[in-house]
């Protein structure tokens, strides 16, 4: 997929953590199209390996993963790096949002994914992170 040019927008290093293959492919493709550099993991173990090896400006993650919770990933990520965490989940109840915030998620978006909303969130966090002009 060709990368779109959005003048003045920051390029972010984003880790996408999503166990559903089709959703992961759509997310990585679209975020890459927006001009961001994307790494993708499908479980807690691979997400933690990425965090040990690379700096990220943001993590966009499903909460429920096959080998644990993304809350574990976010806690570790926030210990290691200054980044913004975006939860993507089908669970939008207050208790779920609170649990995500307690773990360190900065934003909580519900599925099905509203890509315009996700893009708006990323545009808001770009100036606060170390992205580069696209």
State where each predicted segment sits.
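Alpha4 helix (beta4-alpha4-beta5 surface) of REC/receiver domains from two-component response regulators
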Residues: 72, 92-107, 120
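Acidic catalytic/metal-coordinating carboxylates
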Residues: 43, 69-72
């Amino acid at each position: 997929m060709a990368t779109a040019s959005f003048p003045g927008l920051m390029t972010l290093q984003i880790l996408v953590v999503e166990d559903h293959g089709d959703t992961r492919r759509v997310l990585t493709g679209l975020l890459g199209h927006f001009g961001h550099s994307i790494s993708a993991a499908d479980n807690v173990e691979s997400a933690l390996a990425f965090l040990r090896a690379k700096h990220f400006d943001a993590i966009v993650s499903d909460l429920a993963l096959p080998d644990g919770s993304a809350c574990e990933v976010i806690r570790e990520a926030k210990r290691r790096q200054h980044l913004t965490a975006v939860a993507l989940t089908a669970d939008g109840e207050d208790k779920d949002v609170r649990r995500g915030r307690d773990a360190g998620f900065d934003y909580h978006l519900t599925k099905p994914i509203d890509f315009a909303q996700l893009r708006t969130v990323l545009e808001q966090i770009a100036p606060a992170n170390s992205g580069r002009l696209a």
